[in-house]
Amino acid sequence: MPASSVRLPLRLLTLAGLLALAGAAALARGAPQGGPPSPQGGPAPTAAPARGPTLFVLVGDGSAGFVFQLGGLGALNDTRIRGHLLGRYLVSYQVVPPPVSAWYFVQRPRERPRLSGPPSGAELVAFDAPGVRRTYTTAAVWPAEVAVLADAEARCPAAVFNVTLGEAFLGLRVALRSFLPLEVIISAERMRMIAPPALGAGLEPPGPPAGRFHVYTLGFLSDGAMHQTMRDVAAYVHESDDYLAQLSAAHAAALAAVVQPGPYYFYRAAVRLGVAAFVFSEAARRDRRASAPALLRVESDARLLSRLLMRAAGCPAGFAGLFDGRAERVPVAPADQLRAAWTFGEDPAPRLDLARATVAEAYRRSVRGKPFDQQALFFAVALLLRAGGPGDARETLLRTTAMCTAERAAAAAELTRAALSPAAAWNEPFSLLDVLSPCAVSLRRDLGGDATLANLGAAARLALAPAGAPGAAAATDEGAEEEEEDPVARAAPEIPAEALLALPLRGGASFVFTRRRPDCGPAYTLGGVDIANPLVLALVSNDSAACDYTDRMPESQHLPATDNPSVCVYCDCVFVRYSSAGTILETVLIESKDMEEQLMAGANSTIPSFNPTLHGGDVKALMLFPNGTVVDLLSFTSTRLAPVSPAYVVASVVGAAITVGILYALFKMLCSFSSEGYSRLINARS
């Protein structure tokens, strides 16, 4: 048979042609017939590294198939066979661990608590299975027909991450450039492996005993860590049928993959994410409906976590989408508008006002020590940094930097350690965004002594781009290795790398705190600070022609208090507290008249940062003005009482009136009793 004929599509090859090919292969030791047919289309499976002297190749058309067992690697030199070995119908059987006794099984997994309830309310959307079926192909398992619900892939030269969701089916492939691939299949039906004749027909791929689903893990047992990883991921789907518990575990696994780069963390996080999506799709498919907020949550988390994982592997890629546009058609609640805009890459212009209001409200609550929505803040910052003007971006970073206090950074570090603990109970939902926001999207770097938070911050800033934006989910061979621009650095390019903390001003300059004097800009050396940790405050800008190299000392002053209720004298100034140990304690942007009055109230202030009685004697204060002036703040010339609300005045008046009434009633009772008693006494004597 001519060599060119073997390159024809298999659907054109007849049964006689295949038999002729088998007879022409002198090295063939047998051609057992039967078995499932060859896949018709789909991506070519990647051949794994050869590990033995025997090759198995599957060829066939829609009606018949054959497995040829070739005697050795020398068969590759046969041009009549090479066309099939290098073609799309090659099936490599090198992923099955020899011997069979090396297959691994897991015990019953630890069940996780349920965090979400059944879908209810008016925000339900239909979730029906599609009528189109597709052939799912793999390297070691016979092809399966699957009704596909979702299909997503992130790919670059450094890594590939593919997820296929179907009716009671999950196919997941993960491969890294520097490590062996891993494949996980979850199916309600028993799968059959393409096995050597010696192992017999109908052999299941390796995996644990079947529970609600059959779980198969295919990969190379390269070392003990890989063996343990394959055992662990096989148990994920049976831990919980609650999508929110699985998503929480996926966020924790992604956190581990970002802060502890390595193939095993990457594999665990990828499988966690795939299993979370599978559990959600199965519940929605069975109910034929899904909660719109839940569908949006799964879609946005899949895009966010896939991007963070691929960034950890060295790729700027992430999932472009998961549920084939289903999520884009769901009604969006007002609280989820920023999440939806980020997820689908919508035109951000209609959402910019909402983003500004979200950042402002989070800042107001943060200054007063109240909790705020950290996830909404992340999406608001993402929109403002990417689509807002230069003023929006700089003002946003000024606020997030002020919100990033030492206490909040410590809380994020503690939350990270708890999430990374193997004993994490997941009694409540966990999201990576609760760790990332606001410190990871701020200009505060002096709290990054923990490498965990530093790695998270770098990953978070590169994940700020809208997930649906062009180029956010794909990478070419030429551009995959290029670093994506950091939107935080783009908003304030004048800030030097050694800055501990930066406060951007509207005019293109920034106040920066460093340990040594910057190359350009007027610098203030702060006195009374430990010489081992000196603090230098400088005003830097991109205008090199106006560079000022003067060294100064901040002037100590008693600033005048203002009595004008309609003019905010100190608005847009930044109040800073630092300690003699060289630590920046907090920064506060004065943005309103109310905050100005609280600042001048001194010990009567209800804002903790302004109240001097809450800080020790080694703590000093600075006032930074928008024009670049720096003042060592001693006090205000007069102490103003904190403003009293009208409700308090009304309550005080009512309380005083009630008190007077009670006293009057008591007085009348006493007088009446005395008068009546004397009258009786006089009458008795008479």
Curated annotation (Swiss-Prot):
A Pfam family: Herpes_glycoH_C
Transmembrane segments: 647-667
Region annotated Interaction with gL, chain positions: 157-217
Parts of the chain on the Intravirion side: 668-686
Organism listed in the record: Suid herpesvirus 1 (strain Rice) (SuHV-1)
Bilayer topology term: Single-pass type I membrane protein
InterPro entries for the chain: Herpes_gH (IPR003493), Herpes_glycoH_C (IPR035305), Herpes_glycoH_C_sf (IPR038172)
Compartment(s) of residence: Virion membrane; Host cell membrane; Host endosome membrane
Protein name from the UniProt record: Envelope glycoprotein H
Topological region Virion surface: 25-646
HAMAP family: HSV_GH (MF_04033)
Primary role: The heterodimer glycoprotein H-glycoprotein L is required for the fusion of viral and plasma membranes leading to virus entry into the host cell. Following initial binding to host receptor, membrane fusion is mediated by the fusion machinery composed of gB and the heterodimer gH/gL. May also be involved in the fusion between the virion envelope and the outer nuclear membrane during virion morphogenesis.
Family the entry assigns: Belongs to the herpesviridae glycoprotein H family.
PTM annotation: N-glycosylated, O-glycosylated, and sialylated.
Signal peptide: 1-24
Superkingdom of origin organism: Viruses
Keywords assigned: Fusion of virus membrane with host cell membrane, Fusion of virus membrane with host membrane, Glycoprotein, Host cell membrane, Host endosome, Host membrane, Membrane, Sialic acid, Signal, Transmembrane, Transmembrane helix, Viral envelope protein, Viral penetration into host cytoplasm, Virion, Virus entry into host cell
GO cellular component: host cell endosome membrane; host cell plasma membrane; membrane; viral envelope; virion membrane
Quaternary organization: Interacts with glycoprotein L (gL); this interaction is necessary for the correct processing and cell surface expression of gH. The heterodimer gH/gL seems to interact with gB trimers during fusion.
Biological processes per GO annotation: fusion of virus membrane with host plasma membrane; symbiont entry into host cell
Residues listed as glycosylation sites in the UniProt record: 77, 162, 542, 604, 627
